[in-house]
Curated annotation (Swiss-Prot):
GO CC annotation, single: cytoplasm
Source organism of this protein record: Schizosaccharomyces pombe (strain 972 / ATCC 24843) (Fission yeast)
Subunit structure: Self-associates. Interacts with plo1.
Cystines in this chain: none
Signal sequence, renumbered to the chain: none
Protein name (record): Spindle pole body-associated protein cut12
C-alpha cells in the first residue's frame, strides 16, 4: 500500500490564498531554508513573479521503492511530478498597470481599444475614485495599496487601532514599513499567528469586504423586486404581494386550487349529463306505462262488450222460443232440416229414432254468477298478436333505439291469466248434460235454408243421428245439382243392419278446431309464432345494418 499524503488543513489553504493574492507569491522553495530568511527592516526588492516550472527536484520527489511505484492503483508517469498552485502578486510596475484587460482585486479596467478610455467622464465611478499608485516612491507603495482599498470600499479603520499603532511608535517599538513573509507554508502560518497587528488589519479589511458584499446583495434584491413589480402590473394576480394559497375555490390562486376546481367542474358536468339521461329514461318509461295501460283498458272494454253481447243474445233467444222447442243460434239450420219433406232414397238406412231418444233441451235462465261458459281463450291469442305487433313497431323507432323487452306490467299478467284459464266469464246457454247428449258444438250446417252446395258430400256432414227425412232431402238436392255426387254419397253411406249410427266425417270450421285445442297447445303455438316473428325482425335489422 502507498503512503498517505500529507495534506494541509483548510484554513492553511485559505490563508495562503489571501496572502498570495494581497502580498505576493512566494518563490520556488529550495533545500536551504535559513539562507532566505531576511530581516524585516532590510530594504530588499519586491518578490518577482514565480515562474511555472513543473520539473521535479530531488528534494521534493519522495524516494519510494519499485514495488510501491509499480502499484496497480498508480497512474504511470505521475509519481515523479508534484503539482503546485501559484498565486500572482497584485503589486505591478508601470508597465503592468497599463496592460490591457488586466484583472485587479475586485474590479476590472477598460480595454485600450475603447476610444473613450482617456476621458474621465466616461469612466465608471469605481475607476474614477481609484487613484493610481505612486511608482517612483517605493516607500509609499503599501500606503497607496491600502488607500486604494479604503477609497474603493469606503473602509475606515477603527480609531482604537490607529491610536494603538501611534502609542507603539512613541514607545519605541519597531513598526516595520515593509512586511516580508517567509516562503514556506509553516513559516507563513506562524507569522500570521504571532503578528497581531497584521491579523487585525486584514481581518478588518475582510469584514468590510463581506459587509459590502451583503449590502450589494440587498440592493440587488431591491432592484429585482422593483423590476418584478413593474413587469407584473399587466398581471395583477401574479404580483409578489399576493399570497399563493387558495381561500375560495371559485377563484383559486394556487396550482392545487386550480387543479381541484377543474376536477370539480368535470364532476358537475358528468352529474348534469347523468341527470339528463335519467330524465329521458323516466319519460320513456312513463310513455310505455301509458301505452300498456291503454292496452289494458282496451281489452277490458272488449271483454265487457263481448259479455254483454252474449247476455243479450241469450236473453233474446229465450224470449223468442219460449214455450217451443229450444233451438240455439247455431242450430237454426238443424231445425229446418228436421221439418223438411222426405224424398225417396234407394239405399238402406237406419230407421228414424224414437221421440224418446231425442231429448228436449231444458230452458236455463242465465245465472247471476257469470264465471262459467264457453272457452274464449282465443282472445288471449288475439291479445298476444296485438301486443307483438305493437312492440314490433315500438322497437323499430330510430330515435328511441331498440327496446329489448318491456317490464312485467298489469297487461302481461292479464294475458297470462287469460292464456292459462279455460273459460271466460260468459253465460251458459244450456246445461252440461244436454250438451253432452246432443254434442251440438260439433255440428256445422249450410246457411241457405238447409240446401247443400254441389261440392258438399256426406263425408262433410257432422256426427249426428241421420233420419230418413234428412237423407231424402240430401239425395234430392244432390240429384238436382250433380248426378255423380249422388253416386258418391250412396257409396259413402254404410248400410249395415247392425250399425245404427252411420259413421260420417265431421266438417269442422277453423273456429271449432281452435275450440277443440287445449290451452297448453294454443300457448305453445302462440310462442312459436312470436319466436318466428322475432327471428324475422332480427334478420331485417341485420340487413339494415349491413346496407347502412
Amino acid at each position: 500500500m502507498s503512503e498517505t499524503l500529507n495534506t494541509p488543513p483548510t484554513y492553511a489553504w485559505v490563508l495562503k490564498a489571501f496572502s498570495s493574492k494581497l502580498a505576493g507569491t512566494v518563490t520556488k522553495p529550495v533545500t536551504k531554508m535559513s539562507s532566505y530568511i531576511e530581516d524585516a527592516e532590510s530594504d530588499a526588492e519586491l518578490p518577482q513573479d514565480a515562474k511555472e516550472d513543473l520539473r521535479p527536484t530531488e528534494t521534493l520527489t519522495p524516494l519510494k521503492s519499485k514495488a510501491a511505484q509499480n502499484g496497480i492503483l498508480k497512474t504511470p508517469g505521475t509519481l515523479q511530478i508534484k503539482k503546485t498552485v501559484n498565486f500572482k502578486d497584485i503589486s505591478k510596475d508601470a508597465a503592468t498597470w497599463n496592460r490591457p484587460t488586466k484583472n485587479n482585486f475586485l474590479f476590472t479596467r477598460l480595454d485600450d481599444e475603447n476610444p473613450l478610455m482617456g476621458h474621465e467622464e466616461f469612466k465608471s465611478p469605481l475607476l474614477q475614485s481609484t487613484p493610481k499608485p505612486n511608482i517612483n516612491n517605493p516607500d509609499n507603495e503599501n500606503k497607496s495599496k491600502h488607500d486604494e482599498f479604503d477609497n474603493r470600499y469606503n473602509i475606515n479603520i477603527n480609531e482604537s487601532y490607529k491610536n494603538e499603532t501611534k502609542s507603539n511608535q512613541r514607545l519605541g517599538e519597531d513598526v516595520p514599513s515593509k512586511k516580508k513573509y517567509p516562503h514556506s507554508m509553516d513559516a507563513e502560518i506562524s507569522k500570521f499567528k504571532w503578528d497581531s497587528n497584521n491579523n487585525n488589519d486584514w481581518s478588518s479589511l475582510m469584514k468590510d469586504c463581506f459587509r459590502d458584499v451583503v449590502n450589494n446583495n440587498r440592493k440587488m434584491k431591491e432592484i429585482i423586486k422593483d423590476v418584478m413589480i413593474d413587469t407584473s402590473q399587466a398581471f395583477p394576480s401574479e404580483s409578489l404581494d399576493e399570497p399563493d394559497y387558495t381561500i375560495n375555490l371559485d377563484a383559486p390562486r394556487s396550482s392545487s386550487g386550480k387543479y381541484w376546481k377543474q376536477k370539480f367542474s368535470m364532476l358537475d358536468s358528468a352529474h348534469s349529463d347523468l341527470e339528463l339521461e335519467l330524465t329521458s329514461i323516466r319519460e320513456r318509461l312513463e310513455s310505455l306505462i301509458l301505452e300498456k295501460q291503454e292496452e289494458i283498458n282496451f281489452w277490458k272494454q272488449r271483454c265487457r262488450a263481448l259479455e254483454t253481447e252474449k247476455i243479450h243474445n241469450h236473453q233474446g233467444q229465450q224470449s223468442k222460443y219460449k214455450g217451443k222447442e229450444f233451438v240455439g243460434n247455431r242450430f237454426s239450420q238443424m231445425r229446418e232440416l228436421y221439418t223438411a219433406k222426405p224424398s225417396p232414397i234407394t239405399t238402406k238406412v237406419v230407421s228414424r229414432p224414437s221421440q224418446s231418444d231425442v231429448r228436449e233441451p231444458q230452458e236455463q235462465v242465465p245465472s247471476k254468477n257469470l264465471h262459467r261458459g264457453a272457452d274464449m281463450s282465443h282472445l288471449a291469442a288475439q291479445m298476444l298478436t296485438h301486443s307483438s305487433k305493437k312492440s314490433h313497431t315500438t322497437n323499430l323507432i330510430p330515435s328511441e333505439g331498440i327496446i329489448s323487452s318491456t317490464p312485467i306490467s298489469a297487461a302481461s299478467k292479464v294475458r297470462m291469466n287469460l292464456m292459462q284459464s279455460n273459460q271466460t266469464p260468459t253465460p251458459a246457454p244450456f246445461s252440461i248434460a244436454a250438451k253432452k247428449s246432443h254434442l251440438p258444438s260439433k255440428l256445422s250446417f249450410p246457411q241457405d235454408g238447409g240446401s247443400l252446395s254441389s261440392a258438399t258430400t256426406l263425408q262433410q256432414l257432422p256426427k249426428a243421428r241421420v233420419t230418413p227425412n234428412v237423407l231424402s232431402s240430401l239425395s234430392s238436392n244432390l240429384g238436382k245439382t250433380n248426378p255423380t255426387s249422388v253416386y258418391q254419397s250412396k257409396a259413402n253411406v254404410t248400410t249395415s243392419a247392425d250399425v245404427e249410427k252411420p259413421q260420417v266425417k265431421v266438417a269442422t270450421s277453423s273456429r271449432v278446431d281452435y275450440d277443440l285445442k287445449s290451452p297448453n297447445q294454443r300457448t305453445a303455438n302462440a310462442k312459436k309464432r312470436l319466436e318466428e316473428r322475432r327471428r324475422r325482425r332480427k334478420l331485417k335489422l341485420q340487413e339494415l345494418q349491413l346496407n347502412s
